[in-house]
Design a protein with these regions (language model features):
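P-loop (Walker A) phosphate-binding loop of NTP-binding proteins
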Residues: 8
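ATP-binding Walker
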Residues: 11
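Conserved substrate/cofactor phosphate-moiety recognition/catalytic segment
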Residues: 17-58
Length: 164
């Protein structure tokens, strides 16, 4: 089972993915920022976004081919990026209207070494404004989430996904 959690920066994708992965048996989890860091690729141009989507798809397909479920959390701002990923289950976090960097994400990035930008610049980054502008509402989400879920709601979502 290939699960995509998408939404604007700061919408809670990583928060949900981490908790959901704990409640789905034999489930891997890939976070877009971790993959970008490992790849040293912070290019948010159309080409950079396509490379990132391809990387996420490659990791996810590897896990599925080895009999595991996988959760990938990344913005996936366009319908094309979501279709290319080919999720079995798509969760859209519709929790904010404009992308932003939350305090925890800033602290995580500040701990990273050799980033090609200043972390403080992310709060006003054009990349996030561009992401907000280009984000297309998912047409085929299996689940639309508009607020943070309780632990019980996450467990129920995990059961729902496993029964698909």
């Amino acid at each position: 089972m290939k699960i995509l959690i998408c939404g604007l920066p700061g919408s809670g994708k990583t928060w949900l993915a981490k908790r959901l992965a704990d409640d789905i048996e034999n489930c891997a989890w890939y976070n877009a920022d971790v993959i970008r860091t490992a790849s040293n690729d912070w290019d948010f141009s159309a080409e950079g976004r396509a490379r990132q989507a391809n990387r996420m798809t490659t990791f996810a397909d590897f896990e599925v081919s080895n009999g595991r479920s996988v959760i990938c959390d990344f913005v996936a701002p366009t319908e094309h990026s979501r279709i290319s990923f080919k999720p079995d289950y798509l969760i859209w976090l519709d929790t904010i209207k404009e992308g932003r960097v939350v305090k925890e994400k800033k602290e995580e990035l500040e701990a990273a070494k050799d980033l090609p930008f200043e972390v403080e610049s992310l709060e006003i980054s054009e990349a996030f404004k561009d992401t907000t502008k280009m984000f297309e509402t998912p047409n085929n989400a299996n689940k639309v989430i508009k607020s943070f879920l309780s632990d019980e709601e996450i467990k129920n979502l995990a059961l729902e996904i496993q029964n698909v």
